[in-house]
From Swiss-Prot:
Identification of the protein by name: ATP synthase epsilon chain
Membrane topology label: Peripheral membrane protein
This protein's record includes keyword Cell membrane: yes
Name of the gene: atpC
Species of origin: Fusobacterium nucleatum subsp. nucleatum (strain ATCC 25586 / DSM 15643 / BCRC 10681 / CIP 101130 / JCM 8532 / KCTC 2640 / LMG 13131 / VPI 4355)
Superkingdom assignment: Bacteria
Major site of localization recorded for this protein: membrane
GO biological-process terms attached to the record: proton motive force-driven ATP synthesis
Cellular location(s): Cell inner membrane
Membrane among keywords: yes
InterPro entries (alphabetical): ATP_synth_F1_dsu/esu (IPR001469), ATP_synth_F1_dsu/esu_N (IPR020546), ATPsynth_dsu/esu_N (IPR036771)
One GO location term (cellular component): plasma membrane
Complexes and interactors: F-type ATPases have 2 components, CF(1) - the catalytic core - and CF(0) - the membrane proton channel. CF(1) has five subunits: alpha(3), beta(3), gamma(1), delta(1), epsilon(1). CF(0) has three main subunits: a, b and c.
GO molecular function: ATP binding; proton-transporting ATP synthase activity, rotational mechanism
Similarity-based family: Belongs to the ATPase epsilon chain family.
Length: 134
């Protein structure tokens, strides 16, 4: 089976390195699917799911990414992620409660910087909920 290497890292550590037959993730331009021998490519990643399918299609690992960058060259896909973790670790009820608390907190803040930080946290939590449910 044709395959390529997928490496996922954050600023802190290497998260995974594995062989894949297919990789799907969300870029700032929309969802993209990567197959073996893909042309060289660089993209900004948006919040959403990242799916890695094994070369023989017997396993599919799904992760949540909060953004980052993708580079493809020489049959190697490198994902540099802001935040990444397995989708099964998302607790929808906890994220929904967090969103409600953050919205209440948002009503009380006075500076634009505080508002932007809270809005980003809300956006990430909503993206986690969407990724888990879809």
């Amino acid at each position: 089976m044709p395959s390529f290497d997928v490496s996922v890292v954050t600023q802190v550590k290497k998260i995974l390195e594995q062989e894949a037959g297919y990789l799907r993730l969300r870029t700032s331009e929309g969802d993209i699917g990567i197959l073996p021998n893909h042309a060289p490519f660089v993209a900004e990643l948006s919040m959403g799911k990242m799916e890695i399918e094994s070369p023989n299609k017997d396993r599919r690992d799904i992760y949540f990414l909060s953004g980052g960058f993708l580079e493809i060259s020489d049959n190697q896909a490198t994902v540099i992620a802001d935040e990444v973790f397995p989708i099964e670790k998302i607790d929808v009820e906890s994220e929904q409660a967090l969103v409600e608390n953050l919205k209440k907190e948002l009503e009380k803040v006075s500076t634009e910087e505080e508002k932007r930080k809270l809005q980003k946290k809300i956006k990430i939590s909503l993206a986690k909920i969407d990724a888990k449910n879809n």
